[in-house]
Curated annotation (Swiss-Prot):
Pfam families: Arg_tRNA_synt_N, DALR_1, tRNA-synt_1d
Catalytic activity line of the entry: tRNA(Arg) + L-arginine + ATP = L-arginyl-tRNA(Arg) + AMP + diphosphate
Annotated family: Belongs to the class-I aminoacyl-tRNA synthetase family.
Protein name: Arginine--tRNA ligase
EC numbers: 6.1.1.19
Assembly notes: Monomer.
Span of the annotated motif 'HIGH' region: 132-142
GO BP term, example: arginyl-tRNA aminoacylation
Gene Ontology CC terms, in alphabetical order: cytoplasm
Principal location listed in the UniProt entry: cytoplasm
C-alpha cells in the first residue's frame, strides 16, 4: 500500500483495539502482511491474536469486534472493500479497486521517487564498508562488502537519511611493514621459496608488479592523495612502503570504479597516530580507571561491558593491539556528528565488536551502548567451469573483484587492457559483469555463506536471477516500443489518466491483481529492509516482481483492440517498469532497454 494508505488503515485498527483494551494496556504496533493464499485477500492482520491474552478475550470474537469498528471508521472508507476472519483470528482484507488504482497512479506520478522518503527526515548516517588493507587487490570478500555496503547506503538514502560513505584504510602496523619487505625482496630479485625470502611475506604476483614499477621509477596516485614517484632505491624501505601502499590503493580505486562504488571519504589509520588520537584515547581510558597492567601489558576492562574476558590494549613490546586504533577511529565518527554508524565487515571481525564498544563506553563521552551497528557477512566460494576456484593465501592466489567482473562480463576484454589502451569510458564496457556480480552478491542474506557460480552469471535465461529481472524490464520496453514507436517514453504521461478498472476491478485477471499487489508493497519493503539493514530484501523483491510480471505477460495480451483495456494494461506495465528501475537503482544495477 501507499504510506498514507498504510497509515490510515493502521490507525483505524489501532483505535479499534485501544477502544477494547484497558487504558493502561501496552498494545503492539499494527502490521499487515500479504496472505499466503491470494484468494484470501490483499492483506492480513493478526493483531486480534496478539492482544487476545492481554485482553482476556477469545481471539476470534475479538477479531469480529475489531472488524466491526474498522468498517465504521471513516479512514477505512474507500480503502477496504471487505474483511473476513479466518482460523483462530486472522483478519483478511480486500482492498477497493480505487485503492489499487491509487497505487498505480502514484507510481506513474512519482516516477523515480516512488518508494523514496524526503531527504533528511532521519538525519545523517555514516556507512563504513570495504575498508580493505592496502596490502593486496580487492578479493571476492571485499566485493561482497562493496555490494552490501553500497546497496545499504543507497537504501538508507531512499529512506530519507543523509548518507556518508567511508572507507577506512589500515595503512599502519605490521601488515604494511610486511608489504614493504615483500616488495623490497622482489626488487632484490628474490622469489618465494628462496632462503632469504622474508617470513610471512606476501607471495602474490602483484608484489612482483609493484617491485618492477618501483625499480622503473613509475608514478602512482590514489584518488584522494598526491602522486608518489618511486625512488628506485631498494634500500629505502620507507620509500618502498609509501609507493607500495599508493600503488595498491590505486589498484583498489580501479576495482571500485569498475564496480560503480564511490566514497565520500577515505580515512587513513596512520592519521590517527600522527594526530595523536590513538595515544589520547588510551590515556583517557587510563585516566578513567578502565585499564590495568598485568604481565607487562596494558589491559582494558572489557568485561565491564559484557565481554567474556578483558583484552590487551598495549602489548609488552609497546605496540597497540588491533582494536585500539578502531576505538580512536570511532570517536572521530561520533565527534563528526554521526550519531548513527553502520560498519559492514566480514564475520571474522565478530570478536572485535565487544572490544570496540567497550572502549567507546569507557571513554564516557556520551556514545550510546550498541554503537556502532554492524552488518557481518560470511565467505564467498567461487565456482567456474563447474569447479571450485581454489584459493591459497600462502601461494598468494585468490579471486579478486576484478576477476569476477571480467569473468561475468563474457568475452575476452579486460579492465587492464582497456586502461592500457586509454579507453575513456572503460567502466561502461563491464556493465554486464558489474550488474551480475552486484546482484549475485546481494542474492543471499549477509550472514549466510554464498557460492558465486560464474557459469550461471553468464547464462541468458531465467535461471540467472539478474538476467531474469533485467529481461522483465527490457521486455516491457519492447512492448512500449511496439505501442508508441521509438519515442514511446514521451507518451507515458498520458497513461496516468487512464481508466484502470481492467487491471484493478472485478474483471481484472488474477495475474494483473497479483502484479498490482506487488507494486503496492515496494515502499513498505524498502522501509523494512532499511530498518533491518537488509539490502538483500530488495533483490528478493525484484525477483518476485519479475516473476509476477512474466506471469501477467503470459496470461494477458497487452496490445489488444479494446482501447480502454489496452491503456489500463499499459499503465500497469509502465508502473511495473518504474518499480523495476527504482529497485535496481537501489542495489546499483542497470535497467537495460534491450537484451
Amino acid at each position: 500500500m501507499l504510506p498514507v494508505q498504510t497509515s490510515n488503515l493502521a490507525a483505524a485498527f489501532t483505535d479499534a483495539v485501544r477502544a477494547l483494551a484497558p487504558a493502561d494496556a501496552t498494545l503492539p504496533a499494527v502490521t499487515f502482511e500479504r496472505p499466503k493464499v491470494a484468494a484470501h485477500g490483499d492483506l492480513a492482520c493478526n493483531v486480534a491474536m496478539q492482544v487476545a491474552r492481554a485482553l482476556k478475550s477469545n481471539p476470534r470474537e475479538l477479531a469480529q469486534r475489531i472488524v466491526a469498528a474498522v468498517e465504521a471508521d471513516a479512514r477505512a472508507q474507500g480503502l477496504v472493500a471487505g474483511m473476513d476472519i479466518a482460523g483462530p483470528g486472522f483478519i483478511n482484507l480486500r482492498l477497493t479497486p480505487s485503492a489499487k488504482a491509487d497505487v498505480l497512479r502514484a507510481v506513474l506520478n512519482e516516477g523515480d521517487h516512488y518508494g523514496a522518503r524526503e531527504r533528511g527526515v532521519h538525519g545523517q548516517v555514516l556507512v563504513e564498508f570495504v575498508s580493505a588493507n592496502p596490502t593486496g587487490p580487492l578479493h571476492v570478500g571485499h566485493g561482497r562488502q562493496a555490494a552490501l555496503g553500497d546497496a545499504l547506503a543507497n537504501l538508507l538514502s531512499w529512506q530519507g537519511w543523509h548518507v556518508h560513505r567511508e572507507f577506512y584504510y589500515n595503512d599502519a602496523g605490521v601488515q604494511i611493514q610486511t608489504l614493504a619487505l615483500s616488495v623490497q625482496a622482489r626488487a632484490r630479485g628474490l622469489k618465494p621459496g628462496d632462503a632469504s625470502w622474508p617470513e610471512a611475506a606476501y607471495n602474490g604476483d602483484y608484489i612482483a608488479d609493484i617491485a618492477a614499477d618501483f625499480l622503473a621509477g613509475k608514478t602512482v596516485s590514489a584518488s584522494d592523495g598526491e602522486p608518489v614517484t618511486a625512488s628506485g632505491n631498494v634500500e629505502d624501505i620507507d620509500s618502498i612502503r609509501k609507493f607500495a601502499v599508493t600503488y595498491l590503493r590505486n589498484e583498489q580505486d580501479i576495482d571500485l570504479q569498475a564496480f560503480g562504488v564511490k566514497f565520500d571519504r577515505y580515512y587513513l589509520e596512520s592519521s590517527l597516530y600522527s594526530d595523536g588520537r590513538v595515544d589520547a584515547a588510551v590515556q583517557s581510558l587510563i585516566d578513567k580507571g578502565k585499564t590495568y597492567e598485568s604481565e607487562g601489558a596494558l589491559w582494558l576492562r572489557t568485561t565491564d561491558d559484557g565481554d567474556d574476558k578483558d583484552r590487551v590494549m598495549k602489548k609488552s613490546d609497546g605496540t597497540y593491539t588491533y582494536f585500539v586504533p578502531d576505538v580512536a577511529y570511532h570517536t572521530t565518527k561520533w565527534e563528526r556528528g554521526f550519531t548513527k554508524v553502520i560498519n559492514v565487515q566480514g564475520s571474522d571481525h565478530h570478536g572485535t565488536i565487544a572490544r570496540v564498544r567497550a572502549g567507546l563506553q569507557g571513554l564516557d563521552i556520551g556514545i550510546p551502548q550498541g554503537y556502532p551497528d554492524y552488518v557481518l557477512h560470511k565467505m564467498v566460494t567461487v565456482m567456474k567451469n563447474g569447479e571450485e576456484v581454489k584459493i591459497s593465501k600462502r601461494a598468494g592466489s585468490y579471486v579478486t573483484v576484478r576477476d569476477l567482473i571480467e569473468w561475468s562480463n563474457g568475452g575476452d576484454e579486460t579492465i587492464r587492457g582497456c586502461l592500457e589502451q586509454g579507453v575513456a569510458d572503460w567502466p561502461a564496457h563491464f556493465t554486464r559483469g558489474r550488474d551480475a556480480v552486484r546482484f549475485f552478491l546481494l542474492s543471499r542474506k549477509a550472514d549466510t555463506e554464498f557460492v558465486f557460480d560464474v557459469d550461471l552469471a553468464l547464462k541468458q535465461n531465467d535461471e540467472n536471477p539478474v538476467y531474469y529481472v533485467q529481461y522483465a524490464h527490457a521486455r516491457i520496453c519492447s512492448i512500449f516500443e511496439s505501442w508508441g514507436g521509438a519515442d514511446w517514453e514521451s507518451r507515458l504521461a498520458e497513461l496516468a489518466g487512464a481508466d484502470l478498472s481492467a487491471v484493478t476491478g472485478a474483471d481484472a485477471s488474477a495475474q494483473a491483481l497479483a502484479l498490482g499487489r506487488r507494486l503496492a508493497e515496494f515502499p513498505d519493503m524498502l522501509a523494512a529492509a532499511a530498518a533491518e539493514l537488509a539490502p538483500h530484501a530488495v533483490a528478493f523483491y525484484l525477483r518476485d516482481l519479475a516473476g509476477d510480471f512474466h506471469a501477467f505477460y503470459n496470461a494477458d495480451r497487452v496490445l489488444v483492440d479494446d482501447e480502454a483495456v489496452k491503456r489500463a494494461r499499459l499503465a500497469l506495465l509502465a508502473a511495473t517498469r518504474q518499480v523495476l528501475r527504482n529497485g535496481l537503482a537501489v542495489i546499483g544495477v542497470s535497467a537495460p532497454r534491450r537484451m
